[in-house]
């Protein structure tokens, strides 16, 4: 029998061994069945885990998500460790069957948010560890099922806020770790009912102040005695940008000289140790209203916006009091914003009066009044010459609603009125309106449109026929917000008077005028093109003028360089060769001198050196002789060497003198008006100028045919 029991025991052990997942260690002999799968390189939760497991450790693996079936039917599981994995998603109701779970470790994963049903069913959970994740959002109902929590660790995340309402309900909570987040505010009264709280860590957040709470008074006992007991409380708030004013005076009065918290503001206390600052330096600045609306006049039915701004330390809260002395809060016709602006959506005649703006903080309060005048709409006179004013009804502007309600959520009437009027299209200067309301008002004469801009309190009126379904508003300013209302002017059947009724109001903003910028750019572009074209034309004209000047100069230079090549002229008196002398032949004389040769030419030879020595050439006292000029001039260039040697002989002085006399006589007879003038210059007075153009050219010599001169002289004597 004993052997049989032993065999059964071995079979049971073998069966249990087969249930244990691969790579995991199962402690089946311990009173509490434990499955240890830490650091096994698992990519998912093993599916063959014993459902009776009490402790399951899956830390330091590579599990990426948790599915609904992973922990199904594990009703005995008490401790679940999923730390240091790569979990980024948990299926809703994934832990719903773990009704006996006491501790859930999800630290050091990649969770970014906690949804509503992630922790559903964990009614007995005591320890929830979520530190070192990437949490940015926690749903407002995420902790509704974990009200029995004793420890909640949300440190080292990116949280700006947490569901404080859910925290208030965790009456068993004794440790709350919120350090190293971005929390900037803790609502007042959050810890009022957490009497079991023994430790609160809000280190390294963005808190500027801590709300006073009786819970924090127990922190002084821990600081002075150093003994942790159920009645003591450990508070850690270092690393926050504390604003050291009168709101933290209660905290300064606690004796915690062992901590090193510092102040970040105001400027006089920046960087100083919190516990070393005297209490009298924790000051607050009373509020001061710096800007507010002094007076406003609006038309009946128009929207009125009253502004009030104040400064102080701490930031003052702003409230409005109606002319009737009632506190104004969000209602059907009024909206109060956090920045101190009061917005009356549709004004009535009873809204006329003085509204009071009250700015208050712990240091005091300040008040200012704003006068609001409601302009009555024009009405026609009846037969008795009395103006009928329809009753605007009782004002509900001071009707209180739930405090702290969202201004935008109580805008039902405005939304309905905006549905009646729609801006179909809005440009920078126009807006197309469409009317969707039903014309069920009998006796409508016309519709009146009233509008004004954000920066202009002047109302603009437009009258349109009652059959109009659209209307185009012109001459609007670009980038401006407009408040527009449509009123129906009709005949009241009861009083037989003309009455008005607000049909609806709407607010719209015109577009920015980008077209104007493009127009300016096109203007600049056109001007630039005109300048460029004009410059091209001017440059072309200048180039044309320069070309003409260069061409004219070249022609003149070519005319000056055309010098007639003539033979050297030798004086028949002394036979000396005359060089560099200028010869001037008038046109009539040249024609007579070339009488026997039709192709002869006469040129003017002018030398710059001869001009420089003109004084010597023109001397009357010097003994000069004239050279005999033959009737024909020949160039020295084509003359052969033999001819040069012939002309090189020096004739006697007497025949030359006679030849000159005969030539002069002949010229006188042939031309009565012009005589041949020969300017002679001594050889010694001729110098060659260095800058003259003819200085580098070989001087042309004038050669005289002596034989022809002698024959001509004899012919003249015979005559």
Swiss-Prot record:
Subcellular location: Membrane
Major subcellular location class: membrane
Name of the protein in question: Leucine-rich repeat and fibronectin type-III domain-containing protein 5
Source organism: Mus musculus
CDD domains: IgI_SALM5_like
Sequence ranges of the LRR repeats: 52-73, 76-97, 100-121, 124-145, 148-169, 172-193, 196-217
Residue ranges of the region described as Disordered: 385-416, 614-719
PROSITE patterns from the UniProt entry: IG_LIKE, LRR
